[in-house]
Regions:
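A short glycine/serine-rich beta->alpha loop
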Residues: 12-21, 92-98
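FAD-binding core of FAD-dependent oxidoreductases
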Residues: 20-30
Length: 121
């Protein structure tokens, strides 16, 4: 359900609540892999192994083409940059400075390609 997905993914913005850690769109890819491939049996190491392999392959592809999976690195920020928990206003000027929309599209594209290759869609 769209509303549930939006609620679950809201904290992903800004590299997990503006902490500038793993990019939210990368985390979103990983969630989709879990939905497509995972199961609810935590003792099933075969499934877990396959999910982890897929996550690592997607992360490597994203990093290879974009230089990182870390938000602050993708944005060109220094590690010691102090970020507020208050999100910036989303204006046209804001989006001109951010690669986020393009990275979201890129992640969706490689995820779709991967899911097709694995016959999951």
């Amino acid at each position: 359900e769209k509303e549930t997905a939006l609620k679950i993914s809201e904290p992903f913005g800004g590299g997990m609540g503006r902490m500038r850690e793993v990019c939210g769109t990368v985390t979103g890819m990983f969630m989709v892999i879990g939905l497509a491939m995972g199961n609810d049996n935590s003792k099933d190491n075969t499934t877990k192994k396959n999910v982890y392999k897929s996550v690592q392959e997607l992360a490597a592809k994203f990093k290879e083409d974009n230089g990182s999976i870390i938000c602050r690195e993708l944005l060109g920020f220094q590690k010691n940059n102090k970020e507020s928990y208050v999100p910036s206003e989303r204006t046209n000027e804001y989006y001109k400075k951010r690669p986020c929309p393009e990275l979201c599209k890129y992640a969706a594209d490689i995820l779709e390609e991967y899911l097709k290759k694995e016959n999951l869609i």
